[in-house]
Amino acid sequence: MADGPPSIPGPLPSSFDSDQDFYNERPMQKVFRKIKEEPLIPLGIGLTSLAFVNAYRALRRGDSKQANRMFRARVAAQGFTVIAMLAGSMYYQKDREKSKELRQLQEQRDAEEKRLKWIRELEARDDEEKAMKARLEQRRQLVQAQRAEEAEAAAAAAATTEEKPEATSGGAGGILSRIGLWPQGEKKEEEKKVAEELVEETAGDKSGKKKNPKSSLGDLGEIISSQKKD
């Protein structure tokens, strides 16, 4: 019906849900519990056994009347035991159904606990894998950054070397000439050529004017000093 209360999912709560002793019951504890719940059954079993023993003793003595009485008592005690069992089964039928239901619930709880443990274990492994992947990604990014920095530094060094090749070569020649490893014959040949050119210019002057020898020597000295500076 639409106006009725909403249905509760799952089984109804039981009064035995909080009874952990009932769940974790040992076999001997179960036997004693059954004896306490149905005391007439063990009583009928005891009476049947006693009647059988007395009938056996009467037969050993040769007392047939006593033996017959004990056999009748055994049959009566056995019938009493059967009636007690039937009455107990009828009386404790609901409790047995509840115990069966509780066993099923316990099995379901155990299965659910196993499933939850399995899920937690999978989640823990997933977290470990994610953390490992994050560490690997971080290391990869660091390596890429280092490689990029090294490439930038190499490119900058190559650019500086391309911009100043002449300065580096001139500096090397100046250092070699200072320490005496640069060849000095080239300088002497250049000085001779300059002197010869000056002599030819002074000799072949068409104006016929004579230059002052001191001035020509001064010019020659300035040229030689400029060559040395270069």
Curated annotation (Swiss-Prot):
Q: How does it sit in the membrane?
A: Multi-pass membrane protein
Q: Ranges for the HIG1 domain?
A: 12-103
Q: Which spans are transmembrane here?
A: 40-59, 71-93
Which cell locations does it reside in? Mitochondrion membrane
Q: What family does this chain come from, according to its entry? A: Belongs to the RCF1 family.
Give one Pfam family, short name only: HIG_1_N
UniProt name for this protein: Respiratory supercomplex factor 1, mitochondrial
